[in-house]
Amino acid sequence: MRSLVGDLVLVRLQEERDPLLHKRLYNALRRAILDGSLAPQSRLPPSRDLAGELGVSRNTILTTYEQLLAEGYVVSRRGSGTFVAQTAPESSLTAKEERENNSLAAPTAHLSRRGQHLLGQVSASPRQWGAFIPGVPDVNAFPHPLFSKIQARISRRPKPERLSYSCNGGTPELQQALVDYLRVSRGVHCQSDQILITEGIHQAIDLVTRMLCDNGDLAWVEEPSYWGIRHVLAMNDVRAEPLTVDANGLCPPETVDDAPRLIFVTPSHQYPLGAVMSLERRQRLLALARQQGSWIVEDDYDSEFRFSGQPIPALQGLVADAPVVYIGTFSKTLYPGLRLGYVVIPRPLVSDLKHAHAELYRGGHSLIQMALAEFITAGHYSAHIRRMRLLYSRRRAFLTELIQRHCMPYALSDFSDNAGLHLILNLPAEADDVAIAREANARHILVRPLSRYYLTAAHKKGLLMGFASQPEEQMASAFSVLLGCLQTHCPQMLLLREDAEKQNAPT
């Protein structure tokens, strides 16, 4: 006849999935102790008896008991046996306590108002891979074997200092590689000590905002703009003033009543609308920044991916000693999970920003930085970008053709400049782009609503559609699903079947 503990363990064993029997047994007993099914001070059967009840070897039971004993879940009393400990070693709540507490308090009950505000504004999606996701490259096209080979060789005998924290803003190899690359490809003028390696654009924006702004300071942002900028500003109690964007980029005001401390711009390819800032606007913005004592933060977004014409040189290199903090990332050219970006720091700020970065973030990833430096200097990086430019150009043309075949002529963005990794599908003013995106996301179509990129209520409606990450056949299949969402929410923007057939008929 089995004991109560034996019956309990048999039931719990059926719920465990580990291939190793002793681990399934350990997990079953541990879970029973934590949720109160095995009460404190209750006696466990002798190892020989429990082995017989369960039909397993005694060694399996002994191994399990020893593990529970070592971790403090049970205690052994000489001559008396093995007992459940009075207090489980877990510092977290038991499942029962957790359920009771969750019924009494909201998840954000102990967050600061700032933290609650941040979570209330969350825009990052838990899904970061799929059809039409904006800003994500084709990570499968990255030369992983080549990069892994470089990494393996560098990691074979690393110097000890390469395995510690980095307090110099990155490895000298990557800093110099970026100086040379940015000078040739983007017209950026700097020396290697002005390069600071970060863990992406977000960290760069946070560092610059923390170090250059006080509470209540003003920052200009493009309208619409990258939501991450607005969130970082809000978290640092910096006011964000949206400035209109037209076909020539950000529109600086004629007069300035309240001087901004920072001016955030994406002049080479405005995010998300795609406009290129004209030379006249760039010169006006530089003059205004000097006059007002402001710093321009230039996010050189998608500058590598122009599919016609010549790349637009960076704002940073337009004049000597420009009041520009230039930031970039490898997320779009290589892959987002690399988590490497960079800042070109103006000379007067170099020492302070590097020291602040070391204190706030404790930089690292030195071996990956060295591998990336070799990848760049050996010419692999430029070659990869050239290959991707051709691939993305074809995919952009394919998505453009899909939209033109099925949607009204106004569906493609006015500001499209044949660059970047996404298109904007314009929607009628009365459409609810958030609802459309929500329904599409539920069907694993990862479009983003354009209205969410605006700070004010006067916003356009549309969908950001990335074309880089997925091949043409997957885009075609996903577009059919998206058409179903559009048919439900705004059928007026779709061409009738006979109109579509006429438009696509050979002439």
Show where each model-derived region lies.
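Short glycine-rich anion-binding loops that position phosphate/pyrophosphate groups of nucleotides
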Residues: 137, 267-271, 332
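Helix-loop "lid/cap" segments that line or gate small-molecule binding pockets
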Residues: 342, 370-378
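AMP-binding (ANL) adenylation modules
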Residues: 453-457
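N-terminal basic, amphipathic alpha-helical segments
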Residues: 1-154, 348, 354, 358-365, ...
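Hydrophobic residues in well-ordered beta-strands that form the structural core
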Residues: 221, 242, 298, 372, ...
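Conserved core of the PLP fold type I
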Residues: 151-292, 304-305, 310-321, 325, ...
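Active-site PLP attachment segment
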Residues: 319-352
